[in-house]
Amino acid sequence: MPVFALLALVAYSISLALIVPGLLQKNSSWRRMAILSATIALICHAFALESRIFPGGESGQNLSLLNVGSLVSLMICTVMTIVASRNRGWLLLPIVYTFALINLAFATFMPNEYITHLETTPGMMVHIGLSLFSYATLIIAAMYALQLAWIDYQLKNKRLAFSSEMPPLMSIERKMFHITQIGVVLLTLT
């Protein structure tokens, strides 16, 4: 029974249920509970993936496409939760958590298996690790680009009211540029 996966799915759902109405109503009292629920989801997600990727014994690592996708979504969620805990990036959290919820559900409930032995080839392990980190970093940069385009569109069409929740466009652009640079460096190292 995938107990940790089910706990993570419930915790991601609770986080989404707290974040989405809070973003629409500009209410910030929900943030602490949303971060707590997201932290529980991340921990349970990590334990669920650990048991799926390392099934035990000398059988190797299960690096199926769904497990790797769920691992990437875990990395993205971890970074975005850390960013959100500093009162930034809240607009992207529903997208990130929904992505993680779907990936974890597919990885848990759909049978998939691709066993490999990375301990025999450390170069391949470094290559896969750097690839996963660069992929996660570039996805975060792409989400910042979507946020930048959405806010720019809303401002040009005079549909977005100014609030303290809306980050400045220049700071989003600067973050996006730095994150893209980090992703390109990681991809080059891969």
Regions found by a protein language model. Give the residues of each.
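Hydrophobic transmembrane alpha-helical segments in integral membrane proteins
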Residues: 1-15, 130-138
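Transmembrane alpha-helix/helix-exit interface in multi-pass inner-membrane proteins
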Residues: 133-158, 186-190
